[in-house]
Amino acid sequence: MSARLTLLRPDDWHIHLRDGAALPHTVADAARQFARAIIMPNLVPPVRNADEAEAYRQRILAARPAGSRFEPLMVLYLTDSTTPDDIRRAKASGFVHAAKLYPAGATTNSASGVTAIDNIFGVLETMAEVGLPLLVHGEVTRSEIDIFDREKYFIDEQLSRVTARFPTLKVVFEHITTRDAVQFVQAAGANVGATITAHHLLYNRNHMLVGGIRPHLFCLPVLKRNLHQEALLDAATSGSPKFFLGTDSAPHAQHAKEAACGCAGCYTAFAAIELYAEAFEQRQALDKLEPFASHFGPDFYGLPRNTDEITLVRTEWDVPASLPFGEQVVVPLRAGERLHWRLESNA
């Protein structure tokens, strides 16, 4: 087994950077390894139009480390009040690359999300016309639906309707977690892709629940049983261009995770590519990591692939117990444990 792995610099097609005092920390972690990232818009208040996207973009650019060329790719947050004109202006901006569907109540800061998919059909039609991709948090939120089944219900009740009605609309089914989602994406047209997180490749619900609740593995969509984890690993290492890297790195302060009602989200951006390398190595598929991390995402979005490279070295290192997060700290995934790959510091 080689002790070094060189690949085109990857991009992250789904990340949460948060805002304010946290930005210098989250942006630095992302910029260390990624050239570009799709920036989630679920701030308070959310990023609803091109003007708000530009303001957030400028805050991110100001937080970049000295000399960094990290490029934030901005996203609009769809609401029941989003208009076709909002979409046209976003597309014309050149810096908004997608719009995000959060079903109301599905995840962090989603209260302003879409209450019924039919409410935005006019907006989706405009998105298809102008070529602005739709990003989807794929879960229903009805209280009678078991949390482990919400992704499948979303496919059957909503996503299948969207892809049938708008066959030219580019759709990214984000952070998929089930075999059902893998099969849906595989069967769909070339306009439908999916991101897969490192934590859903490395863990299943037993890791979160057996022997005690591990709050730093709690995320939404929640970890599923191991048969779904295996389906995700098969998809990520298959070489299919429909599946690409999206960390869904979602930091929360330590006190907000380690609480009676803890927040959902795993912080992985500090070592994202190392975590993916570990998952791919477990499948003896390190040769498939570069296409998944560096080729298929930009290809789907119609953007050029990066030209510079990064190098991973196979060496063990200890993950810190916590990392700075504004005036708070965040507990990263695998805190206090060891990782087996490390990005060269001069990459």
Curated annotation (Swiss-Prot):
Q: Tell me if Nucleotide-binding is a UniProt keyword of this record.
A: no
Task: Give me the reactions it catalyses.
Answer: (S)-dihydroorotate + H2O = N-carbamoyl-L-aspartate + H(+)
**GO CC aspect terms:** cytosol
Q: How is the cofactor bound?
A: Binds 2 Zn(2+) ions per subunit.
Give the record's pathway.
Answer: Pyrimidine metabolism; UMP biosynthesis via de novo pathway; (S)-dihydroorotate from bicarbonate: step 3/3
Q: What is its EC number?
A: 3.5.2.3
Positions that bind Zn(2+) 1: H14, H16, K100, D248
- Name assigned to this protein: Dihydroorotase
Q: Which organism is it from?
A: Stutzerimonas stutzeri (strain A1501)
